[in-house]
């Protein structure tokens, strides 16, 4: 089973075609959209469905130049590490002895190991956070979350912050592990994310299901 098997039907639906039309029209009038067209579906490119072990949900892509590249929380090489990702790194350093905070914010290495880094909205207009939140992406990403839940066993879902936690109803908690906390942003990191041990708990769960653990080092 691969992504095209479970998403082909979704991409034929009217709402999905409207998303693509909207993006094409925005480009025609000269608006800058992030990530670039080639990178919008990178989460699906780097994490194979048959290898998917962990889902980390983000909200919408970074909205400044050279940041977003289709993976939630991740930025391209050579770009400053954003505050939320810096706090994710601090939690990893606190909870995993061998983790050392890297000098970059590119999480492709996680994605290739089976960490699906999904933003619930896949595009954004330059410098306008949440500008594409109502164009239909959440219909698509809700379907993706539900299809992962239905078609895969033993997946770890990390839901950080109120927006991500609202997606819990799409997940069969009897067959998956759902880990919840506050968002790692500086505004809310101390309301539960700091000290959450999610990365340790994820690997403990994967081990209990005889699955390969994630090497969180970057």
Curated annotation (Swiss-Prot):
It catalyses: Hydrolyzes single-stranded DNA or mismatched double-stranded DNA and polynucleotides, releasing free uracil. Coiled coil: none annotated. Gene3D superfamilies: Uracil-DNA glycosylase-like domain. Pfam families: UDG (PF03167). Keywords: Cytoplasm, DNA damage, DNA repair, Hydrolase. It is found in: Cytoplasm. It comes from the Bacteria. Its EC number is 3.2.2.27. SMART domains: UDG, UreE_C. InterPro entries: UDG_fam1, Ura-DNA_Glyclase_AS, Uracil-DNA_glycosylase-like, Uracil-DNA_glycosylase-like_sf. GO terms for molecular function: uracil DNA N-glycosylase activity. The keyword DNA repair applies. The active site is at 60 (proton acceptor). GO terms for biological process: base-excision repair, AP site formation via deaminated base removal. GO terms for cellular component: cytoplasm. The keyword Hydrolase applies. HAMAP family: UDG (MF_00148). Belongs to the uracil-DNA glycosylase (UDG) superfamily. UNG family. This is Uracil-DNA glycosylase. It comes from Francisella philomiragia subsp. philomiragia (strain ATCC 25017 / CCUG 19701 / FSC 153 / O#319-036).
């Amino acid at each position: 089973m691969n992504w095209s098997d479970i998403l082909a039907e979704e991409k034929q639906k009217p709402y999905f075609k409207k998303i693509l039309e909207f993006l094409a029209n925005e480009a025609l009038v000269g608006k800058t959209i992030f990530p670039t067209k080639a990178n919008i579906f990178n989460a699906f490119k780097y994490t194979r469905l048959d290898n998917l072990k962990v889902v980390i949900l983000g909200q919408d892509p970074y909205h400044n130049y050279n940041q977003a590249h289709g993976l939630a929380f991740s930025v391209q090489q050579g770009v400053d590490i954003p505050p939320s990702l810096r706090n994710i790194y601090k939690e990893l350093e606190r909870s995993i002895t061998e983790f050392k905070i890297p000098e970059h914010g590119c999480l492709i290495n996680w994605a290739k190991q089976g960490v699906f880094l999904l933003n619930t909205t896949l595009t954004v207009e330059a410098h306008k956070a949440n500008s594409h939140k109502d164009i239909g992406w959440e219909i698509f990403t809700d379907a993706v979350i539900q299809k992962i839940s239905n078609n895969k066993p033993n997946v770890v879902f990390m839901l950080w912050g109120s927006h991500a936690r609202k997606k819990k109803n799409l997940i069969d908690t009897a067959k998956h592990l759902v880990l919840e906390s506050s968002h790692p942003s500086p505004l809310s990191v101390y309301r539960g994310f700091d000290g959450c041990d999610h990365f340790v708990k994820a690997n403990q769960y994967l081990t209990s299901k005889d699955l390969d653990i994630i090497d969180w080092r970057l």
